[in-house]
Design a protein with these regions (language model features):
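C-terminal transmembrane helices and immediately adjacent loops/tails
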Residues: 2-203
């Protein structure tokens, strides 16, 4: 969160703001729509991470792929509320859990970046070939650098500083699966933004 809070203010101003009507000086900076988004996102993250935590205490995990086997899913729904659990998570399990948490926050960084901008990451990737100047104007090197630091820093922490965080290094395969598992945090909202942007242009 600290690095994300540093990355977002580094973004250049959006010129489209000049086309919007002035904000009511008596209105709150965090309006109802923004508050609903914050609460909904926080609640979804909490429920997912709480369920994952409970699941790991009932089912020993040695790789991310084990979480999606038929037996694992059966255990999740059959034993999730039973009091019998392991005494603690292993260092490898903690590494998986910690990395999932950080990657979810990383993807959400882009959701915050595109909030109320009428743009999307998918649209920006397409515009890299059609209108690269617009895309470059919406980013800067500091944002990209901090985003890279978050990812590289997480890999370094889990791989080389595990004893400080009670985690163990995880495999390259598990890193790939964690990226895929957490990417819907960005992909689903971004698809909605992209489709909404196309519809608004057609009006």
């Amino acid at each position: 969160d600290t690095f994300a809070a540093m990355a977002l203010p580094s973004l250049p101003p959006d010129r489209s703001v000049l086309s919007e009507p002035p904000r009511d000086p008596n209105s709150h900076i965090v309006d109802r729509r923004m508050m609903r988004r914050i609460v909904a996102t926080g609640l979804l993250f909490f429920l997912f991470l709480a369920a994952l935590w409970q699941y790991m205490f009932h089912m020993p995990i040695e790789s991310v792929s084990e979480m999606f086997t038929a037996d694992s899913v059966k255990v999740f729904f059959a034993d999730i509320f039973k009091p019998k659990t392991t005494l603690h998570l292993s260092g490898y399990e903690m590494g998986i859990y910690f990395s999932i948490f950080v990657l979810m926050q990383f993807w959400n960084l882009f959701n915050v970046k595109y909030f109320r901008t009428h743009h999307s990451l998918i649209g920006d990737i397409i515009d890299l070939f059609r209108n690269p100047e617009r895309v470059k104007a919406s980013y800067n090197k500091y944002f990209l650098l901090i985003a890279a630091v978050i990812i590289v820093g997480q890999v370094i922490i889990v791989t080389f500083a595990g004893s400080l965080f009670n985690v163990e290094p995880i495999s390259a395969e598990d890193w790939g699966l964690i990226i895929l598992l957490t990417s819907p945090v960005l992909i689903i909202p971004d698809l909605y933004r992209f489709i909404s942007g196309l519809r608004s242009k057609q009006r």
